[in-house]
Amino acid sequence: MKEKVQTLQDFGEVLHEVRRDMCYATDLLASDLKASKSLFGGVWTGKSHNIEHYIRVFRHLYSEAHNDAQRQKLDDALYALFHPG
């Protein structure tokens, strides 16, 4: 993981992976998925965002994570982002 996350875009990709895993793990209603997409906005479309946007997404995913493995993946990504190399 540590070598994977070197930029904000890398961090966004990990957030997307965890979000996708969370969606597959539950039966999300279409309205829930739509609301989720509007919260995350351009993270999934490749638009650039500042660090505050990514942290807001991280916090939301962390609070909604279904298990320790998802939380650990988020923890590892955040650590790697701020401790490169």
Predicted regions and their residues:
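Recognition helix of helix-turn-helix/homeodomain-like DNA-binding domains
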Residues: 33-49
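DNA major-groove recognition helix of helix-turn-helix/homeodomain DNA-binding modules
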Residues: 51-72
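Short alpha-helical "recognition helix" segments of helix-turn-helix
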Residues: 28-30
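A short, Lys/Arg-rich alpha-helix, primarily the initiator
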Residues: 1-22
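Short, charged recognition helix plus adjacent turn
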Residues: 2-5, 42, 67-85
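Helix-turn-helix DNA-binding elements, focusing on the entry/boundary residues of the two helices
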Residues: 15, 26, 54
